[in-house]
Amino acid sequence: MKANLLALVCTLAAWTASAACPESNTASCAAQRTLDELRAQAAARIVEIRATPNRAVPDGAPTYYLSERTGRDDADGRTPATAWRTAARLARAKLAPGSYVLFERGGVYRGTVKVAPGVTYTAYGTGPKPCIYGSPEDGADPAKWTRTENPNVWAYDIGRRDVGTLVFDGGAQHATKIVIRTDKKTGARFNKFTGRPFNSYRDLDGDLHFWHDYYEKGTGKVYLYSAQNPGERFRSIEFNVKCHGFAVGGADGVTIDNVTVKYVGVHGIGAGTCRDLTVSNCEFGWIGGSIQAEGIFGRDYPTRLGNAVEIYGGCENYTVTNCYAWQVYDAGVTQQFNIPEKAGAKRYDQKNVRYAHNVFEKCNYSVEYFLTVRTKGNASRMENFVVEDNLMFDAGLGFCEQRPDRNEGAHIKSWGVGSNNRAKNYVIRRNAFCCAGDMLVQIGSGLKNADGSSSMPTLTDNVFIGRAGQSFGLISETSNARAAYGAGTQAFVDRFGTGNRCLILPAAAQTP
């Protein structure tokens, strides 16, 4: 997306709308026209991302090849003719910094890619981007599904890595995961999604609702409610098992480029404290939903997780650019860390973070960040944090609607005001924040910098599009109160920068 194209498109849409709409409805008509223009621009941008050409490999760089079509794990992996076939074989290789790992286009590589420091992972050949699937297999086989004593509940033996969802026919439909809420006083157990009593798969009662008995003494089976054998009902069934697509850990100097990551229960790319992580020209779809842990945060139900690209910890030189993330349980991109009290004054700065030229669609949060400081005197902060030239749509909608906290989705999410999010040189510019299930943004910090300066971002030339009366969210250092989206939003946003435009769609029709 050109640096000035977003503002130009929105200006043109507003002018054409005002010329064609009734005087009483000019503003909302302009908002709808602008939204339509931006969705068209995003569709074209997605086509460009998917068609990104292969990256050039430097002469003399150690290079390894994987091919689902012709590869063999007993080969040496050093040429296209002697390519490996699986991510499991790649995991056994010792890769030197400066190496390149090339996945053949058109192939599907199942399992986690374990990343080595200083290595670039990208594509070769022709056709669609190579696909990294966390799903161990396609479950559209009637013989693998067994009818239980409940005639509408079918069992599939998937093992004990928790399944975050099942995706049918490439995303035409998906399953709703049932987790159990346990009343702390009575011990009674309930379906967290419906509120009805629930003790086992026998209590499933909604089409494509499922429960996974992943517990240590459980069966390891997924139980899915369906009137018909799922293997007959669907052409493909993929499982978001509890794993990453790429497991970076603390590896420095990693580039992940030109791949598609799908059907993982945790993160598409999961990293800890690291430096020089670059993610470019990638697509992420159907990410997350697996259980992080039971009973954390004082909850009486399990907590689920799943981001397309995550660093949990400190970082320096972290870039995500020219990517498309859609249908993500948590965040499209994120850097985050809760600094433990035992860290004392140890710094976990997040420096030189840039999210640019991406398209986010139906992620609970398009961009999420937090840097929570629990120890007085810890000076950790975000520095040179830039969010620019991104197109963001429908936060909190889609797959993530099965979350228990259905009022927290936002395009930028920082979890409000508190002992968190100290920031210097934080810039949000030339983005489109379009529609959300709840609020557009939640940007907060309760910490100043050492020189007394604000941790709030500068907002420049962004476009906000929301419905009248719905939540705008907040941008604040002092209050977690959320503001409604309406006539006063423009003046509020103008306090944080110039050139921003707030366009208002008409209020949604009430369901009878």
Please report, for each region that a protein language model flagged, where it lies by residue.
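Extracellular polysaccharide-degrading/modifying enzymes targeting complex plant/algal/animal polysaccharides
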Residues: P22-G265, G270, G285-R304, I311, ...
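Predominantly extracellular beta-rich ligand-binding scaffolds that present long acidic/polar faces
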Residues: Y109-T120, G139, T375-P512
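Extracellular beta-strand/beta-solenoid scaffold signature
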Residues: G139-A155, D207, F239-G245, Y263-G270, ...
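Right-handed parallel beta-helix
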Residues: D252-Y263, R275-R299, L305-A308, G313-S366, ...
